[in-house]
Curated annotation (Swiss-Prot):
Mg(2+) binds at D63, D65, D118. It comes from Methanothermobacter thermautotrophicus (strain ATCC 29096 / DSM 1053 / JCM 10044 / NBRC 100330 / Delta H). It comes from the Archaea. This is CCA-adding enzyme. CTP binds at S51, K54, H141, K161, Y170. Keywords: ATP-binding, Magnesium, Metal-binding, Nucleotide-binding, Nucleotidyltransferase, RNA repair, RNA-binding, Transferase, tRNA processing. Its cofactor is Mg(2+). Gene3D superfamilies: Archaeal tRNA CCA-adding enzyme catalytic domain, Beta Polymerase, domain 2, CCA tRNA nucleotidyltransferase, domain 2, Poly(A) polymerase predicted RNA binding domain. The keyword Magnesium applies. SUPFAM superfamilies: Nucleotidyltransferase (SSF81301), PAP/Archaeal CCA-adding enzyme, C-terminal domain (SSF55003), PAP/OAS1 substrate-binding domain (SSF81631). Catalyzes the addition and repair of the essential 3'-terminal CCA sequence in tRNAs without using a nucleic acid template. Adds these three nucleotides in the order of C, C, and A to the tRNA nucleotide-73, using CTP and ATP as substrates and producing inorganic pyrophosphate. tRNA 3'-terminal CCA addition is required both for tRNA processing and repair. Also involved in tRNA surveillance by mediating tandem CCA addition to generate a CCACCA at the 3' terminus of unstable tRNAs. While stable tRNAs receive only 3'-terminal CCA, unstable tRNAs are marked with CCACCA and rapidly degraded. InterPro entries: CAA_C (IPR048833), CCA-adding_arc (IPR008229), CCA_tRNA_nucleotrans_2 (IPR042090), NT_2-5OAS_ClassI-CCAase (IPR006116), NT_sf (IPR043519), NuclTrfase_I-like_C (IPR011068), Polymerase_NTP_transf_dom (IPR002934), tRNA_NucTransf2 (IPR015329).
Length: 454
């Protein structure tokens, strides 16, 4: 590295006290689980995995992942039941709160001593050929990083994760579509250090392949970036990365290398001033429409794909009606409210719409058209009329469209919420009552460059 990152690392790297607290709790939990398994005669072993096990977690963001692995001969129902029982038992012994979740199969999350701890049952495998479920790879991932990442490179991983986080490109969940932690670690292995990753990213193009172990399977994937999993030749670690986030990371890398400011390791400053946001909108000369509804009782991994599907359908219908959309996005507090926002280039249309009929030369069709319509003229060779629009404003059109949601391609649970109730408003009419988080989202929506340059 050519830049001094010591001051940045002081803010993002766990200090001695934090490291000790996290590791002591992790070790105690693993010991508790293994003790419970022995007491109950369960053939299973707990092991610490993830960023805590690899020493690559950002300060204040230690999510402890403990996998409970069972022999391959264990029936799946028994694995689920015994794994959950051990997780619940451990959480109870530590006086924590439990929440059951679901990935490829159920697991339990505990909130213990201020930390979020996942207890995940899986199968004990030695290589990917023995894979029974997607989570089984995680132990192999942890082992690979532990064996290949040099101690000094852990600082580079922290810098890369924080840079990605501050530029909005970190996180493989659907809502973000960015870089997973394991992917960031592999990039450091490939390029050597933090700056090496940024310089290497400038060479990326859609379909770019990174294959650390030379598996030779990269051409079989069609994702924007292909990083062949070192422990599973048939998996692309970057499969969740969208082209948008990939391009944003390349842009942020280019900006940083040209001006390596420490501000790139801090989140952008987004406005929470409603007047400032409406002022920005006024200068742009556009209008923002806000569609709001409730939050369905589904996990966030199910919520956001449904929002994306619904919003895409809304935009398609608006465009087909003649209302031009500059940009669209969605946001939810995941408890009470869900919002879809659309910045409109054209939000109001003339009272009449020009419609074209058959060519003048079409004897049968022209006569029927002329009988049906008055005030017909010719443009080119087509009979033409003016027809009154049903909806001149995009707001009016959307209220009508959403009141008959069968006309939209919507996510199932979002559709239920819209049928229960929704509102369609101009941003100017509702921004005064908006919460801080929504205002920050709106500023980011109107100023997407803020995440990528400082």
């Amino acid at each position: 590295m050519t830049t001094d990152y010591s001051n940045i690392l002081k803010t993002i790297k766990p200090d001695g006290d934090e490291y000790r607290r996290v590791m002591e709790l992790s070790d105690s939990l693993v010991e508790c689980l293994n003790g419970l398994a022995e007491e109950q005669g369960i053939d299973a072993e707990a092991v610490l995995v993830g960023s805590v096990a690899k020493g690559t977690w950002l300060s204040g963001a230690a999510d402890i992942d403990i996998f409970i692995h069972f022999p391959l001969t264990t029936p799946e129902d028994e694995l689920k039941e015994s794994g959950l029982r051990l997780g619940y038992g451990c959480i109870e012994r530590f006086g924590g709160e439990a929440e059951e979740r679901y990935a490829s199969h159920p697991y339990v999350t505990g909130y213990i001593d201020g930390y979020e701890v996942d207890f995940v049952p899986c199968y004990r495998i030695d290589d990917a050929s023995m894979l029974r479920s997607a989570v089984d790879r995680t132990i192999l991932h942890t082992r690979y990083i532990q064996e290949n990442l040099r101690d000094e490179q852990r600082d580079d991983v922290l810098l890369l994760k924080q840079f990605m986080k501050s530029t909005g490109t970190y996180g493989s969940e659907f809502r973000v579509g960015g870089f997973a932690g394991y992917l960031a670690e592999l990039l450091v292995l490939r390029y050597g250090d933090f700056e090496g990753v940024l310089e290497g990213a400038l060479q990326w193009r859609p379909g770019y392949i990174i294959d650390l172990e030379g598996h030779g399977t990269g051409k079989g994937f069609e994702d924007p970036l292909v990083v062949v999993d070192p422990v599973d030749r048939n998996r692309n670690v970057a499969a969740a990365l969208t082209l948008q986030r990939m391009a944003e990371f390349v842009t942020a890398s280019l900006n940083f290398l040209g001006n390596p400011s420490p501000e790139y390791f801090q989140p952008p400053s987004y406005s929470t001033d409603a007047a400032e946001i409406t002022g920005t909108l006024s200068c742009r000369g556009s209008r923002v429409i806000v569609i709001s509804t409730g939050v369905p009782d589904v996990p966030s991994d199910a919520l956001y794909p449904q929002l994306r599907k619904t919003l895409d359908s809304v935009v398609k219908n608006l465009e087909a009606e003649g209302f031009s959309v500059l940009g669209a996005d969605y946001w939810s507090d995941e408890s009470k409210s869900t919002f879809m926002v659309l910045e409109m280039d054209v939000w109001e249309l003339p009272s009449y719409l020009k419609r074209y009929g058959p060519p003048v030369w079409s004897r049968r069709h022209r006569e029927r058209f002329l009988r049906k319509h008055e005030r017909v003229w010719v443009e080119g060779s087509r009979l033409t009329i003016e027809s009154p629009r049903r909806h001149r404003s995009a707001v009016s059109y959307l209220r009508d469209l959403l009141s008959k949601p069968d006309r939209l391609r919507m996510g199932k649970h979002i559709g239920v919420e819209i049928r229960r109730g929704f509102s369609v408003d101009l941003l100017d009419d509702v921004i005064g009552e908006a919460e801080k988080e929504f205002l920050e989202f709106m500023d980011a929506f109107l100023n997407p460059w803020k995440a990528l340059e400082r």
